[in-house]
């Protein structure tokens, strides 16, 4: 049986938060005592707060400590997906607004997948807003440098040749606010390239 630990919405503060510190101490203690056990960890989103531009140091330290507490190999057993707070503030033209304007022109029901398929040039500016997240993910996991994988884009990473893990960024249209719209690049997720990576007899 495979067990995994899913953690989400870390929202680490740059300064010490007593409640957060207590929660982290309790979690790490349970991991070290084996009350919490996992074969791999999936950490999904909000590794910092939107207004703490580029400040991922607390999450970087925590994830290292967590993986050590669980006795896991961070390079093989940690999987990351960004959240809506993991975008950089807009500098210049807003790529989200450009995308929504085009989506509205394409069809009345704002069919995002259709717009991404027809206007692939709109995707890179959306992904570029995750540049600080990309830097953190690359510092944690060498696979994002060696294989050319984009930690903010759709991609597959196998876990120890036993399980395929498909990474989907649902925060493409996020702006750091609570009322953001969710969107994912379904065209890439269903592409022949991704389907090929999902082959090999692994679930």
Question: Model segments located where?
Answer:
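Active-site neighborhood of divalent metal-dependent phosphoester bond hydrolases
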Residues: 65, 69-149
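Amphipathic alpha-helical scaffolding segments
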Residues: 57-62, 99, 183-186
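N-terminal active-site segment of His-dependent metallophosphoesterases
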Residues: 1-78, 88-90, 195-199
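Residue-level signal for short, function-critical loop segments
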Residues: 10, 47, 84, 169-174
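His/acidic metal-ligating clusters that form di-metal
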Residues: 33-40, 148-203
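Generic detector of ordered secondary-structure context
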Residues: 51, 93-95, 160
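Charged/polar, solvent-exposed surface patches and flexible loops
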Residues: 25-29, 61, 65, 128, ...
């Amino acid at each position: 049986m495979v067990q995994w630990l899913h953690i989400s919405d870390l929202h680490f503060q740059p300064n010490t938060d007593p409640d957060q510190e207590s929660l982290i101490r309790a979690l790490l203690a349970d991991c070290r005592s084996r009350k919490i056990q996992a074969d791999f960890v999936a950490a999904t989103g909000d590794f910092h707060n939107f207004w703490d531009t580029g400040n991922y140091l607390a999450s970087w330290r925590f994830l290292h400590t967590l993986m050590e507490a669980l006795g896991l190999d961070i390079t093989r057993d940690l999987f990351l997906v960004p959240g809506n707070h993991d975008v950089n503030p807009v500098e210049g033209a807003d790529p989200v607004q450009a995308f929504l304007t085009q989506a509205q022109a394409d069809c009345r029901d704002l069919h995002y997948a259709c717009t991404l398929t027809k206007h692939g040039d709109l995707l890179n500016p959306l992904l570029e807003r995750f540049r600080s997240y990309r830097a953190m993910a690359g510092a944690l996991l060498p696979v994002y440098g060696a294989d050319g994988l984009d930690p903010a884009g759709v991609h597959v990473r196998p876990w120890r040749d036993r399980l395929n893990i498909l990474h989907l960024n649902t925060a493409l249209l996020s702006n750091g606010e609570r009322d953001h719209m969710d969107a994912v690049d379904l065209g890439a997720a269903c592409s022949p390239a991704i389907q090929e990576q999902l082959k090999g007899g692994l679930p």
